């Protein structure tokens, strides 16, 4: 999430909620692993876009949602110097 100003080791504050608006940064659980991504839902497709140009987007069919779940909305972060 470096392109969003969030660096490794920063504390990110999450408001627990099951949905977010397109383009918002969310905590997302993928196969039991947590990650931060920008979420875009278009029809039956969910695209999880990293805010880091070094990584490609992840695309899921909405039928895959048993493996993918939005845990909450990122509402702020603290950068530790």
Describe each model-derived feature in a short phrase.
Residues 1-81:
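Acidic/glycine-rich C-terminal interaction modules and beta/coil loop segments
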